[in-house]
């Protein structure tokens, strides 16, 4: 797996500035929550860094990855392009950063919608994304 600095450099180059700053805020929020709730801080940091890795891909790029990986979208997912980055995110994180930890990949996958029986890490990334101090829901 790539190191944290490599991940930050890649994200700074590939996300719009506001999204990158949001990502750094999610990292700090996730680390604080992980510390508080006894979750591996390094896993929280990695998942938080990668949670929006696919956010700035075009709809066409996202759909191409979805189709190439034989992912079946629900009706709601098909009609809500804003969810596609979280569906594709784990695939891009695995390819770009070499992330293979299923717990981290799950946290990336479910950071927008949540799901039943979420792990503590899933919950931390979901919450950190929503509550990080600089969050701007217009991005």
Task: Name each region found by the language model.
Residues 22:
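N-terminal glycine-rich anion-binding loops that anchor highly charged ligand groups
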Residues 2-4:
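Non-catalytic terminal extensions that flank enzyme cores
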């Amino acid at each position: 797996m790539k190191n944290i600095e490599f991940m930050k450099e890649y994200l700074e180059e590939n996300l719009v500035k506001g999204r990158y700053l949001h990502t750094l805020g999610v990292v700090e929020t996730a680390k604080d929550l992980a510390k508080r709730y006894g979750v591996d801080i390094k896993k929280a940091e990695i998942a938080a860094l990668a949670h929006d890795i696919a956010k700035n891909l075009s709809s066409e790029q996202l759909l191409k990855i979805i189709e190439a990986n034989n992912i079946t979208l629900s009706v709601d997912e098909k009609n809500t392009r804003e969810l596609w980055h979280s569906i594709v995110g784990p695939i891009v994180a695995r390819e770009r950063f070499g992330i293979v930890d299923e717990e981290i990949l799950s946290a990336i996958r479910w950071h927008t919608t949540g799901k039943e029986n979420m792990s503590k890490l899933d919950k931390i990334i979901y919450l950190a994304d929503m509550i990080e101090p600089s969050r701007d829901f217009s991005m």
